[in-house]
């Protein structure tokens, strides 16, 4: 289904002014935003995700850059997914973590972990000094079917212990959409990988076909991990396909 065919008669789409790209140094970016945001319900949002949109708080957007189409939406095919050796190790290493599915709400412990993660993994990136309001607007505000999953160590008595990982995701009619994940930055053992593996397992349990991983950029080192979750589909020129133009065969299943 193309964007023009969606039941979006009451929506408008506008382009933002340019801003520095977060992924490609020296580049300027723009976004296309769906408005008014309060009309983007769960049904419409799911269709927009299939057309390459993402969500940040109450804003639904997709890249709309001048002369650049590097941001490529990607999704994992849940039923066909097979973890590689390193992913199996990550899953085994963190198999004792206890996951609790919650509605998004502010918890000081989550916010403290978020700041530690930003200051360690993304220092100077602009989010390492987010206020409570900025954190809430970015991750906790939602008008769709969103979930916050917290992962804790298991204590000797079986009770949940220290917080290790938090994921925000949206439940769609055909999959889970990964909004954001942050974790204890000093922990070893690929917690981020474990978080994606948990989402794939959860989608399979729910009978959903996909896990949407957001945007992938071929020339962005920090996004290379996404191509390890195979088979992966790429949204290119409005169509989901199993390969990416000029992508090395070694990076595809």
Swiss-Prot record:
Pfam (any one): ATE_C
Listed transmembrane segments: none
Record keywords: Acyltransferase, Cytoplasm, Transferase
InterPro entries, per database record: Acyl_CoA_acyltransferase (IPR016181), Asp_Glu_LeuTrfase (IPR017138), N-end_Aminoacyl_Trfase (IPR030700), N-end_Aminoacyl_Trfase_C (IPR007472), N-end_Aminoacyl_Trfase_N (IPR007471)
Localization: Cytoplasm
GO biological process, one term: ubiquitin-dependent protein catabolic process via the N-end rule pathway
Molecular function per GO: arginyl-tRNA--protein transferase activity; leucyl-tRNA--protein transferase activity
Coiled coil start-end: none
Annotated EC: 2.3.2.29
Reactions catalysed: N-terminal L-glutamyl-[protein] + L-leucyl-tRNA(Leu) = N-terminal L-leucyl-L-glutamyl-[protein] + tRNA(Leu) + H(+); N-terminal L-aspartyl-[protein] + L-leucyl-tRNA(Leu) = N-terminal L-leucyl-L-aspartyl-[protein] + tRNA(Leu) + H(+)
SUPFAM superfamilies named in the record: Acyl-CoA N-acyltransferases (Nat)
Xref: HAMAP family: Bpt (MF_00689)
Known role: Functions in the N-end rule pathway of protein degradation where it conjugates Leu from its aminoacyl-tRNA to the N-termini of proteins containing an N-terminal aspartate or glutamate.
Family listed: Belongs to the R-transferase family. Bpt subfamily.
Protein name: Aspartate/glutamate leucyltransferase
Source organism (scientific name): Albidiferax ferrireducens (strain ATCC BAA-621 / DSM 15236 / T118)
């Amino acid at each position: 289904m193309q964007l023009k065919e969606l039941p979006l008669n009451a929506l408008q789409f506008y382009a933002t002014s340019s801003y520095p790209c977060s992924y490609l140094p020296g580049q300027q970016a723009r976004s296309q935003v769906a408005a008014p945001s309060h009309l983007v319900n769960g049904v419409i949002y799911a269709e927009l995700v299939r057309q390459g949109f993402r969500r940040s708080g109450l804003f639904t957007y997709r890249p709309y850059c001048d002369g650049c189409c590097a941001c490529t939406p990607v999704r994992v095919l849940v039923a066909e997914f097979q973890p590689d050796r390193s992913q199996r190790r990550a899953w085994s290493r963190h198999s004792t973590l206890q996951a609790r599915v919650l509605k998004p709400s502010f918890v000081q412990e989550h916010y403290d972990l978020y700041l530690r993660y930003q200051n360690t993994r993304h220092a100077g990136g602009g989010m390492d000094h987010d206020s409570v309001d900025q954190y809430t607007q970015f991750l906790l505000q939602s008008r769709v079917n969103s979930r916050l999953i917290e992962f804790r160590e298991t204590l000797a008595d079986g009770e949940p212990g220290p917080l290790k990982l938090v994921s925000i995701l949206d439940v769609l009619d055909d999959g889970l959409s990964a909004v954001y994940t942050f974790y204890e930055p000093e922990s070893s053992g690929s917690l981020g990988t474990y978080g994606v593996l948990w989402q794939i397992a959860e989608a399979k349990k729910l009978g959903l076909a996909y896990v949407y991983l957001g945007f992938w950029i071929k020339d962005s080192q920090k996004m290379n991990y996404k191509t390890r979750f195979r088979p992966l589909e790429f949204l290119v020129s409005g169509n989901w396909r199993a390969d990416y133009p000029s992508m090395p065969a070694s990076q595809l299943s």
